[in-house]
Structures are given as C-alpha cells and as structure tokens.
Amino acid sequence: MYVIHLAEADESNASISSEEDLGHLDYSKPFAAKQTQPKKSISQIIKDKKKQTQLTLQWLEDNYIVCEGVCLPRCILYAHYLDFCRKEKLDPACAATFGKTIRQKFPLLTTRRLGTRGHSKYHYYGIGIKESSAYYHSVYSGKGLTRFSGSKLKNEGGFTRKYSLSSKTGTLLPEFPSAQHLVLQDSVSKEKVDTLIMMYKTHCQCILDNAINVNFEEIQNFLLHFWQGMPEHLLPLLENPVIVDIFCVCDSILYKVLTDVLIPATMQDMPESLLADIRNFAKHWEHWMLSSLENLPEILSEKKVPIARRFVSSLKRQTSFLHLAQIARPALFDQIVVTSMVNDIDKVDLNSIGSQALLSVTNDQDSDFYSEYDSISVFQELKDLLRKNATVESFIEWLDSVVEQKVIKPSKQNGRSVKKRAQDFLLKWSFFGARVMHNLTLNNATSFGSFHLIRMLLDEYILLAIETQFNNDKEQDLQNLLEKYMRSADASKATFTASPSSCFLANRNKPGVSSSDSAVKDEIPPEDDYLTLAAAQQGLGAGTVVYHSADPDNFTIAGQMDFSQNSAPLMTPPISPAMMNRSSVINQGPMAMRPQTSCPIQGQLPCQTFPEPLYQSLHNPPSGSYPNASYYQPMFRTQTHTESGRYAFSGHHLSKDCFSNSCTASPYGTRGSSGGYTAAGDAGMETEAVQMLESSGFGFGGTTGAADGCSGPVCSSGHRYYGSSSGYVDAPRMGTFIDQHVSVISSVSSIRSVSAYAEAHDPLNILDDTSRKTRPYYTELSAMGTHTAGSSIAHSCSVSAPCMYGAPAPYHSQNTLLPLQGATEIREMMSSLPPINTVFMGSTSGPP
C-alpha cells in the first residue's frame, strides 16, 4: 500500500493525505473473488459507472448543502461515502475520484488544510451537513445544549494559543428594534422613541467596547451617566410598558454579544487575570444597574434586573466551567493519571451503590424518571471514555447526549415539566457521584484528586446545560413579547436573532454584497462608495463616475454627502461637516503665513483629499471623464480667462519669493499638481509646452506612464479631467515619496497662496547627473510651470506644506527653466539665481 504525502497547497482537488482516506481498502474484494466473476463488457462498465455516479450525486444532494464559512474534514465526508456504498452494495471509488464527483455537485467547493504543523488535515470549505441527514448528529451531536457544544471540530489540530479579547476588537452590536416597526399608542412620538433607542444602542456599544478593552470599572460610570442623565423630554417614555419591554429585548441582545465576546466558545485557555476580571464584573453588574436606576420608574428595575441576574448567573457558570476545563485538560492528556483513574474506578462496585435505599424508591406516577439503572449505565459509559483517553470535548459531547436522552426528550414526550425532570436527574446524579467518591476514599485511591477534578467538571457542565435550557425558554418569552409589539413578525425575528458583527470581518452570509445594516462596519468598504487602493491600481477605467453637470454654481456641499446610490467608484469619500471649514494646524509650513504673491484664489470650495501614495498609484482615466471639472476646487478646475486677464510670461519677472526655502505641495502630496486647465478657447498651449509634463507628475493627459513623458498634444482642450500616471522614470525617487508621511488633516478652507512654480527637490543629487540634464524636462517640475514664450498662464495656486526632506534645495536649477522662455527672459532670470553647484553641491564657485 502506497501512502501519498501532500504538499502544503491549500487548493487540492484530488489528493488524499496519509491518515485520512484508507478505509476504502476494507471494501476491496479479494483478487481471487474477482477472477470468478464474469467479465463485464466495456459498455456495461461505463453504464454501471454512470449509474453509480448518478446515485452518488443524488446522495450528496440529500445529505449536504452549500454552507458559506463552514469547514468539514475531508476524511469524515469520505467515511460517509464509504458507509453509503456499503449500504447500497456499491464499489466505492477512491478518494481522488470521489473528490471529482463532489465538485460536480458543488463546483465552488474549495479545500483548506487546517491544524497545527504535523497535525493538519484537509477540510472541504463551503459545505455542511443537512440537519435532515443521518450523519448530522454523528458529526455535530445535534445543535448542542450549550455554546461549547460541537467544539470538537473547531479544536481539531490542538490549538494552544490563549484567548485574548483583542481578537474581538471592532465587534458591533446587531440592529435594535426600530420604532417604525413598533405598534405604539398615538400619543407616543415615534421620533422620540427612535431617538431613545438610538441613544440606548450607543450606550450599549460603549459598554461592549469597554468590556473588550478590559475596562470594566468604567462601565459603572456609563450606566450612571446614561440613566441619571436622561433628558427631561424623554423621561415620560420610561413609564411606557412597551418601551420598557423593548429595553429588555435590547438588554438580551447586549448580554448575548457580551457573553460571546468574553467567553470563547472554542474552550480556548484563558489567562487567569482575565477570568478574575470577568468574575469581578459579573459580581458587581447587578449592583451597578440598581444604582443607576435609582429615582426612575420602578417598572424599569422590575423588568431589567431579572434579565441581568440570568446574565450574571450564566457568566459565572461559564467562567467556572472554562476554568475547570483548563485544569482538567492536562490531567486527561496524562496517560499515567488516566490509567490510574481507570484502575481505581474498576474497584468501585456500581451495582451496590445503585441498590441502596434512596435510589430503589420509585413512584408509580413517575416510573419513567431517571432510575438507578440509568445511573449505573451512565457511569459505565464514563469508564469507557476514560479508557479511550477521551478529551474534554468528548466528555462534553457525551454529557450533551445524556442530558438530551434523560431529561429533555422524555419531558417533551410525556409533556412533563423539564424543570421537574431536571431536578430529579440532578438529585440522583449528585448522590451517585458522591457515593462513588465515598468508595474511592475508602479504597485509598491514588487518583482521588484527579477523579474529584473530573467530577467537578462534569457537574459544572450539567448545571450549565440545564440552566441554558431554562434561559432559552426565557429568551423565547422575550421573542414572543417582541412579536406582540412588532408590526411584522419577520422584522422581530431578524432583530432578535441577529448575530454580532465585526468591523474587521466581512459579512459571510452575503458574500460579495455590501451589507445594508448600517451598524455593520465592513472590513472592506463598499466598492460603490469609495475608491480603494486595489481598485485604483487597476485603473479607473469605464467604471469612473462621469459628472455631467456644467453649472458649478448649483453644486454645493452641505454636511456629509451620501454616495451610496452611485454605481461606480468615486474619487473622494464623504467629508465630515466639522472638517469642511476648518483650517489645518498640521500642514502649516514655512509658507503658511506668506503674503499672496501669486494669483488670487477664486471662489473656494471644500475639497476632500487622499494621501499621496493613493494618487501615485492611480492610472489615468479615459478622456472626457470629468467634463468642465465643476465638482472640484477652483485650483483643479478648467479656468477660462479673457485675453486681457492673461499673463504673458515675457512681461513678468520672477521674484525671489518664487524660489523659497520651503516645499510646496498640493493636497495630494508633495508632487506638483496642476493649478489650472487650459480653457477650450485657449490656443496657447502648444505641443512643446506639453512636453514639460512627464508621467512621474500629476499630468493631464491619459498617458499610461511611458518613460519618455507626454508626447503630442495630450493636454489639449479635449482632455478636461484630472488624472495621474503610475509610471515614474526614477524608481528610487518614487519610493522616497511613498515612504513620506502625509497627514490626514489638510488645509481645506484657508488655502494659502504659494509661488507659481514648485521647487525641484533633489536630496540624492539626481539632477546633477549630466545624462539627465540633457533631457528637455525633469520629472519633479510642477505642472504649474508649463508655460511657453508668448503663451498665457492660467491662475493657479497650491497648498503649502512642510518640506519632507532634510535640506531641500531653495532654488530651481537653471537648466530646469530653459525650456520655459526665450533667451532674453533666461538672461534676466539668471541674474537673480545662484549657480547650480551652489544650490546642490554647496560649492561657492561660479556657474559652470
């Protein structure tokens, strides 16, 4: 027999592991028997194979279902298939062939390798067992009686990392009931009820956040602040029975999420300090609530306190059980201890204990109650589990079946009270266990301490399972109460059964669809609302939002805008109203208070900005994406000026203010951004001027990053959009810009004027390269300086920012300005500029 060892690949379609799928060999018929069978024709073999495949597909349809987020061990599924073949008297296919058959039925099924190194197993991801299947209870042990039921599969592989509340950071509460769905009296304002429920949900979210941060002491302050600081106009609502019952429903939702967050259902080990903090929190919770409800209507405390007590009791019970499970787990893994326990329990005469007077007394009316024979059989099963070196999870699975068979199911069959049946079971279970411990004491059992620990663990879980059943009944009463007040029963069920979400976890119930729940903070924002970096790297393309409005006066920003109805990514996300007209105190560099020496700013419009690395990665959209640019700040708009308003470059001299010692940056980073577009009627923008724009800057053209920059009249009047290129001539310089920190808050309203020309930063002395000087343009020249002799210049200004380099060059290179103007202007300008080696080399010699 050959054993196939798998690689670490996760997406395996046909391979099997060495430990999983060997059972099919048991079904192989002896070779001699096969020789005696009549040989089938090829057509008959194909026909039988096709028939068996159809039967297998139908069997898969009857027993399994697509279930997003569920993992099922591949060996278990193959074992089910072998059982099916045995019952149907079919020759089972190998695991590889069976894997292909599964994918015929579930084409989207994937395979994952889960578990620690050396103990990993392959799992089918995205498939689950139907509850109607005969295999459901054998794998999941039913739905389980507690949160810890069914954790066997989750813990398979032996995860040992301790539980941390930091893994729950970002957990959000599900939706609370809405006043729009409540049946209220006409005198009750739905607006006030909605306000009160919204306030209470915020209050509950604060409690949850502080619990996750292990800041339990602060929770008392939140309780006092909310209830004792209730606004006067909302106080009458606290006397309304419907509103109080809705508070109880909200409390139940909060307690469910708190329990899920504080206590891991996978029975991970928890730090002792965290367990102590949770116990202390449970100890004080009821007192904190009663203190916060003083001087408020009595109906509040009458309804809220019983629910709080159930929550506290459940929290204490679960922490106690989890603590005992952590202590008992090493004992159950110790083979010497387990062997000693088995030897000691074998010396106990269980029949003599069962025949004692208390257990032998029966009532004719309650003849179906838990008897002494049941006690003996249960403890016999316990001995068998110890012999099999069962884990804590196996004991839980066994106890679930015991409580289900001995308490819950008989109560449902004969209509008797579950509480009465549970009381009888607990009485006889405790008595039988005490007599077993009595015998161990008399026999001087060496494993008495270990057995006492195991017994405490079993007792605690049985109490937890029964209490959970009682709590579930109370939860059902709240559900019925909510349905009574809701207009739609479906709405009440959706609200009450909603699961907590996480802002760091995607919604698994609806993959690929953005959640409509406003309380759910998705891990990835909806693609309809924002332009993510991944989308930006793929280019805007045809999905770019096209703005058709040509009237800039009709476009205003009032508060936070909602772009949820758009079907394509937007360039900017909504901005907070508080940030719209607030100046920045972060980006105030040396140019912050400089008087205006360039063109004046036109009408100002608040503009949202992105960090520079995002815009460096954006590809240019197709032309015509942003006609008229009416949705942007004036510095990014197409600006049309009359002939008299244009600035001829030859008619103006550049002052030294244009060459300051600070960097200038647009709101998108340190790279120069164009301050204006050439208007449709402006013919001054010629091809040679366009050559000043290179793909490394934020050009206006649609270039895809060619190394030679823009070629041709790419900045003509037909291209009215703001684009950027992802191509950069100098890769090291690109990395330098990406590594720089770009502050989140940028100056929005009080835009400070800067010089009409950006500086060329060269911390690595790249511009000193003679081979680069021969080029007709430089990558770092701002697009604001794209002018030719005799052409007009559009009014533009940029936002100043601190220089991102240690020692920026305060002046432009002479060679940088050579393509801009004629010989006369160059000579006049050179008289006011220092030599290039003085700027970049620190030399005091004259110009080269």
Swiss-Prot record:
**Key word Transcription present:** yes
- Is Nucleus included in the keywords of this UniProt record? yes
In Pfam terms, one family for this protein is: RFX_DNA_binding
Gene Ontology MF: a single term: DNA-binding transcription factor activity, RNA polymerase II-specific
Stored InterPro entries = DNA-bd_RFX, RFX-like, WH-like_DNA-bd_sf, WH_DNA-bd_sf
Question: What compartments host this protein?
Answer: Nucleus
Family of the protein in this entry: Belongs to the RFX family.
Report the function annotation for this chain: Transcription factor required to direct islet cell differentiation during endocrine pancreas development.
Quote the protein name from its UniProt record: DNA-binding protein RFX6
Which organism encodes this protein?
Answer: Danio rerio (Zebrafish)
